Each structure stands twice: as structure tokens, then as C-alpha cells.
């Protein structure tokens, strides 16, 4: 039986882990990020990978920093056949990568070399890409720079957001990994080096990116809204208050009104953006309120806004 050290943290990693278990791989350990305090009550939350591991009675390691840790020494001493990572979220030292008998393999949520880094799925949406996919790759010291074992593309639908793409890609990642592992194990796999001239990076989303700017076109704003749904969410600043926008669509009409102005508030709630473009807001969350569809917003708080009023803070 082929032994695996599995490393993953978010929901994206769970189908990959469960796929390995169901396919009969021996999971020696699951390595995931430490538990975190979340919400106003600061409750301790386990990572999705840890929850899945405990369900299957697998040993779990959660080093704050893997490099130089006692946990890393434990993992090296396991002499596993494979390391498999899926959105683990930490740097893996070369010493550890080289400690396995066969290979260290990563399931990455983009078509490398496009979107190396921590937010490949979000950047495919931010940039309005029409497709994305999964890369099964060899892990090396440099981030996401290893040779490619296999790739598969999927179409990005207009209604997709980060949440739906994460779900689709985690299933695709599981399936492509399980299809590719036998040829990695028996040595017959053909590796393709990444083209260094085509490398694009996707660094983690910053707090600044969460705020929608009226210098954006409606399409750019909508792409950002999709990229930040369900977490952390994009927002406009309206009269000094955060106004989250969970879902929107680019309107078919244009407007000569100043960007940040209410274009319509009867039957729809539309705001002007750069280049005379208009965005229809479909699901919103005013500061201190729950998420609501636009009909409920217009029946309540939204009824105070009038067409032609500049409401978005610059």
C-alpha cells in the first residue's frame, strides 16, 4: 500500500483527502494549519481538513510553522512514499520534500504557470478569465514552480464566484490526482517544465482589494465581487459605512451620471461606475444588517436613496 503524508487546510482540500482514503492509500498523517478563533465570540474553529481527518481517525499535526519544527522531524521519520498537498498554506522545506520515497505532489487550483501563489481561483475571476483548471505538479523549493504532471481545464461560467469555483475545482483536483498518481508511482509519468516567460502570480487578497472603487468599470467591480464571495466579501463605502455587495450583474444600459451615483432604485438598484457603465446590485448587506436580496433592501433602507444622488464615497 502506498503511504501518503497529506497536507491541506480549507474545504478545497477535503475531497482530495477523502478521495485518497477511498482509493486505498495509507494516510500516515494529515498536516493542517492550527485551529483559529473566529467570530465575535472568538470560538475555536478546526480546519475543514482536520475535521475530515478526525472523521477517519487519522493522526493530525498542526505546526504553527512547519520549518524547523518537531512535527517536521516526525514527518521525515515516517519515510512515506508521497507527500500530497492541496491548499496547505505554508512553505515546505526542501529537506522535508526530499524525505519521501517517490515524490511530493501538489494539487493547484490554476493552469500553471498562470497564477502561482495563494489566490489562483480569486485571480481567475478578478481578471475575467473564461477558463481555469487544475494542475497536478511536482513540488520544489520555489513556490508553485515544479514540473507539471497533468492539467485539466474547466469553463468559468458567468454566475460562478470563488465559492462555486472552489467546489468545482476541488472535485476536479481529486479526480485528476487519482488518475495521475499511478503513473507517478510507477515512474511512467511525463513531466513538463513550466514556461518561465508565462508565469503570472496571484498573491493573497489584501484588505485594500476588498473595497470596490468607482474608478473601476461595472465589469471590473462585478469580477471583484465574484472573486470575494463567499469570503471575505467586497464592499462599497456609502456615506461612511461599509456596504457589502455579495452579488451583482453588469447592466445592459449606460449612464452619463458621475461614477458612484444611483442610476435606478425602482425594481432594481443600480449604481454608475467608470466609463459610463452601470452595475445592478442583486444581494447586499448594509452595515450591521444581515445579507438581503435587493427587493428587501429597496423596501426598507434602500428606499431613502433617490435617482441622481451620489452615494458612494470616493
Curated annotation (Swiss-Prot):
Binding site for (6S)-5,6,7,8-tetrahydrofolate: 110-113
Enzyme category, top tier: transferase
Pfam families assigned to the protein according to its UniProt record, in alphabetical order: Formyl_trans_C (PF02911), Formyl_trans_N (PF00551)
Catalytic activity: L-methionyl-tRNA(fMet) + (6R)-10-formyltetrahydrofolate = N-formyl-L-methionyl-tRNA(fMet) + (6S)-5,6,7,8-tetrahydrofolate + H(+)
Gene3D superfamilies: 3.40.50.12230
PANTHER family tied to this protein: METHIONYL-TRNA FORMYLTRANSFERASE (PTHR11138), METHIONYL-TRNA FORMYLTRANSFERASE, MITOCHONDRIAL (PTHR11138:SF5)
NCBIfam families, sorted: fmt (TIGR00460)
Protein's UniProt name: Methionyl-tRNA formyltransferase
Organism this protein belongs to: Lactobacillus acidophilus (strain ATCC 700396 / NCK56 / N2 / NCFM)
